[in-house]
Amino acid sequence: MTDAENVWAGQTLWVYMLQKGSMDLAYYKAPAVGTTAAAETEVFNNKKFNAPNAADNTKSGLATTADGTIAYYPVSGNYDFWGYRVDDAVAGDPVVKLVNDAGDEVAADQATKRVVDIKIDGSQDIMAGKAAPSTDEVAKLGNYADNFYSAYAARKGVQPNITFNHLLTRFTFEVRAGSKATAGLPAGGNTDAVKVTGVSVDSKTTGTLTVAYTGETKAAADLLTFTGDASALTLKQRDAALADNNAPLVALEPVSLTWTDDAATIGDVIKVGEALLVAPGQTEYPLTIALSQDVLQKVGETKVTMPLEQKATIKMDGVKAFEPGKSYKVTITVYGLEEIKVTATLVPWVDGGSIDIDDDRNPNEGEYTEPTPTTPEPIEP
């Protein structure tokens, strides 16, 4: 993915504002009125936000609450801002649990993290992040890093910027014909071009996303953990009729292989589908390519469609693991059915000699005469 493509498109984000260094929610306290106690309002408790729109063409911009509400800092206190995106890897709004390091659900004052369970299908982009001030912003706060984020920091022009990191491994796919016959050449022959009808990768699908935590900063690989067995995730594509980049992906349309340069040794490279986002951390991923090819099975009949399948393994060196937040381009060389053409070559008879049988002699002992050697043609000087 190019930097130009790495822009927001109005995705749904979820945001927490927590008391600094803890899992406790931040509350805004309204002033007391006479004998009426001050009311407490949660500021951002798993609040739904919208990222900047695609029209903004930006990778960093102001996110807005989905319901249009405006929030304000409490008069005192410092706070942490956390954000995450689960796409549709959860049914409905995400349910976040407070847990300790052992994974047991506990009260907020005993919790060390907030987590949400997800299930991926290969199309979701799971992201998470925490706001952290830049060096320049810390300088604006008098080099007191603990003064963020707060009403004081806001007065100094320092507001939370949550950096969202991609937590899955991304595969994009290209295909090419490995032979001219695979691309349906020569035209009018007994086999048409192979079509790629599906691509799938085996990956774990059930995981737990850590959306906020206490303690030292965690690596991206530690924020999303997967359990259970792997299953096939199927490559999909964007709906060409829809301009909304957030619209659900649709089933892959068949892609015919081509070969335009007759002098080339390999077919044209063709992009297939959108991308597959899989659980990171594996050294290899089983890959299955579903194919079809129209072939003539009998002279005088019409061609029939033959389903084919090609299996492979996506790996670098078998030792290095695929990392979260990285996109890898996978180029697949495809081979279709090759017509069997049997050539018959007739070997001439070789003179084996003659056998003379005479009853006046012993009829059981014929006389064998070696064949006359063939005189080789003279070689002209």
Where in this protein do the model-derived segments appear?
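C2-type phospholipid-binding modules
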Residues: 304-329
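Intrinsically disordered, low-complexity repeat and linker tracts
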Residues: 1, 322, 326-381
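Short, low-hydrophobicity acidic/polar segments
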Residues: 1-200, 236-242, 248-260, 265, ...
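Short beta-strand segments
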Residues: 26, 42, 197, 207-209, ...
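Short linear, low-complexity motifs centered on an aromatic residue
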Residues: 186-205, 338-356
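Contiguous ligand/interfacial binding patches
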Residues: 199-250, 254-255
